[in-house]
Amino acid sequence: MLVLLAGLFVVHIATAIMLFVSTIANVWMVADGIDSSIGLWKNCTSGSCDGSLSYGNDDAIKAVQAFMILSIIFSIISLVVFVFQLFTMEKGNRFFLSGSTMLVCWLCILIGVSIYTHHYAHSEGNFFPSSHQGYCFILTWICFCFSFIIGILYMVLRKK
């Protein structure tokens, strides 16, 4: 049981770090053939991330930014609550609070990435003629899976 909780703790920390990276880095869409990428915050061309987003004032991108930041916040809160419950909770109880907080993180990731996918991932007008999803987009979907698994495991596990 201790090994399972330690492994869950490590995966939770890795998920929080991946959420930070995917939200901060500007590689959500990458242009084919030229050294350019587009993120949630800036356009990057030839290693310089000076350009602001052409659609930076759109409500959809602001919603994606907000939900990704909320997912980071809920992931960290869930981690702190898990550690707190680990040391203060009586034996036999379940980690409901940390599990439900992590599932809220999962929901924020789902909403944010779904909005981005709907509005920007397949829109040819906003991006380069030929582009593909960058590592941040893929990393966010990986965090989506991990946060769901972690949230469910927190809800199922009992402290022994």
UniProtKB/Swiss-Prot annotation:
Q: Which residues are glycosylated?
A: N43
Protein origin, superkingdom: Eukaryota
Q: Does the keyword Membrane apply?
A: yes
**Subcellular location, record wording:** Membrane
* Any one of the GO BP annotations: bleb assembly
For this UniProt entry, what's an example GO CC term? plasma membrane
UniProt keywords (A-Z) are: Glycoprotein, Membrane, Transmembrane, Transmembrane helix
Summed up, the tissue specificity of this protein is: Most prominently found in the gastrointestinal tract, skin, lung, and brain but not in liver.
TM stretches of this protein:
1-21, 67-87, 95-115, 137-157
What the entry lists under InterPro entries is as follows:
EMP_1, PMP-22/EMP/MP20-like, PMP22/EMP/MP20/Claudin, PMP22_EMP_MP20
Note the topology in the membrane.
Answer: Multi-pass membrane protein
As for family, the record states: Belongs to the PMP-22/EMP/MP20 family.
Checking PANTHER family in the record gives: EPITHELIAL MEMBRANE PROTEIN 1, EPITHELIAL MEMBRANE PROTEIN-RELATED
- What protein am I looking at? Epithelial membrane protein 1
Species of provenance: Rattus norvegicus (Rat)
Gene encoding the protein: Emp1
